[in-house]
Amino acid sequence: MKVKEQHLWFLGFTAVFAALAGFVFWGTWSLDVAPVMPDDMIVHPMAYADCWAKSLRKFLSSGKFIPSDILWDGLLFSPYFCQELKYAFSLYCAGLGLAYFLRGRGLSPLASCGAGLLLAFCGYWASLFSAGHGGWFVWMTYGVFAFGLSDRAVRKGKLRHWLLLGACTAWGSFYQADLWLLFTVLTGLYFVWCCVRERKFPWKGTLLAAAVFFAIGAPSFRSALVNDLAGRDRQIASGETLSAASAKDEAEKRWIFVTNWSLPPAESAEFVIPRLNGDTSCPMTLSLGARYGTGVKPYTGALGRPKDAPAGNYRQHSLYVGFVTCLLALVGIAFVFVNATSSPRLKKVDFDLGSDAARRRIYDVTFFAVAAILCYLFSLGRYCEPVYRLVYALPFGDYLRAPVKWHHLTEFCLCALAGYGIEGLLNLAWLKGRRGGLLAVGALVLFGAFDLARTDRLYCAPVDLRRVRQTDSDMQMSVLRREDFANPQVAEMVKRGAVVSLANYLGNPDLYLVEVLTPRKPAKEPLPPWSAAAWLGCLSLLGSAVVVVSVAVAAVGPRCAQACSR
């Protein structure tokens, strides 16, 4: 059987991604080792029954269950096996989603797959695994595909595109409501842009996608309105940061709280210069990084600094978009607009797509260029107050903490533009059709992806879990002084393996980062009663099943009928 070219590109993309992801998480793929992830569990029950019981409790109390929970909840494989795999798989889906989108826009396989690789390992996008922000990674498993589905649904109007558009947008909402809201607004604007570009509004398909969206996302929307907003109000009322607690009135307190973690303008240089102000503030990552020689450095910038404070910061991620990514994005903008505005005699780039396709390409590049600029300005937060006040005044805008989150959208837009830059290089008049040119551009993309992965690698600090798994214990990480080990109780715990030293704490020879093991208590919690959330969860599961079956039938049915007719 002849292998199609598109399948070869897919396999190539997968192979390169697997190699780079293996490099990023190198040293933690063993079941006995996991990366530091402060906001995610790295210690799990060994029994599958406990994983299933935990997932059932979650469903009965919140109604939440989506396809990726099979991986994230450890329902089929050991949760220790899935610890790094679930993050890597989400990054893979994000890269594949951008490649899917750009292929639909007519870009070549190299441009599409290259942009996907750059997105998958983009600094802020990928390095948040070190913080354990699993909800963000669950969103990217589905959310990026919504752009390609929006484009195809408007252009082609096929049933499966509308069903998947509603489903993917809903699935992405379950565990990271704030970032989901930002990207859903961007997706919605792009959907409207597609309608303008194609000069039509398919209202029937839109209604179908909306019905699927609300049916599947019902438990998530209920949780956001009932729990998340109330929780954020309690955070603000308690004045959880020093600067917010000292505010003059409630309005100022809310503004300070929401705009903490604004991106300092001077740190925008890190978009193209990696590690300009160090790497991370996480003491566990720094301590273990020094122990294993990863080269990670303390963060010395101002991100996370309280308002008007002379010092202080906190971040657990990179801001590096990539020099190659930014360069290709600028090339994409320049080539498209130069090609559109120059006379045929002066054109240096031949896209060879016809005037209508060229017009649509300009639409897309314009959209992502403007979106990148706006999202960057929004990420500045209180450092660009007149602009961010516009976001703050929108519905739910005063609930969206940490304006630096807008940098995720900036990264996405720049990677999409980078795809157009790759395409522009491939279509230079003196490179087009030459294998050497293809190899040169491909090498540039691979260098850019490796450069990003090399930076992400610094945030992977391995934690030894052998003793935890051998005894099926719970574990907490703590800091002990040298003299604490002279305590008879601590000495006895060290002797029987209940206290395991991991590294010197922040390089201090008198402080130690340790694991403290405690016996795992049997899970005797009764199952929560059936609730309204569980009924909404049943509706969500039914909607998901209908979408999956319908799409499978639409994809496989014609082929089966063709095979039977032979």
Task: Indicate residue ranges for each PLM-predicted region.
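Perimembrane helix-loop-helix junctions
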Residues: 183-214, 224, 235, 333-354, ...
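Membrane-interface coil-to-helix junctions
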Residues: 17-95, 117-140, 249-321, 381-397, ...
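Transmembrane signal-anchor helices characteristic of membrane glycosylation enzymes that use polyprenol
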Residues: 9-44, 212-226, 374-377, 447-452
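Membrane-embedded helix bundles of polyisoprenyl
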Residues: 17-20, 92-105, 109-195, 205-223, ...
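Start-transfer (signal-anchor) and selected internal transmembrane alpha helices
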Residues: 1-26, 205-212, 327-330, 334, ...
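Membrane-helix boundary/interfacial segments in multi-pass membrane proteins
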Residues: 42-44, 125-137, 306-319, 374-414, ...
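Transmembrane alpha-helices and membrane-interface helical segments
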Residues: 96-100, 144-152, 187-195, 325-339, ...
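Transmembrane helical bundles and short interhelical boundary loops of multi-pass, membrane-embedded
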Residues: 221-227, 231-235, 428, 432-566
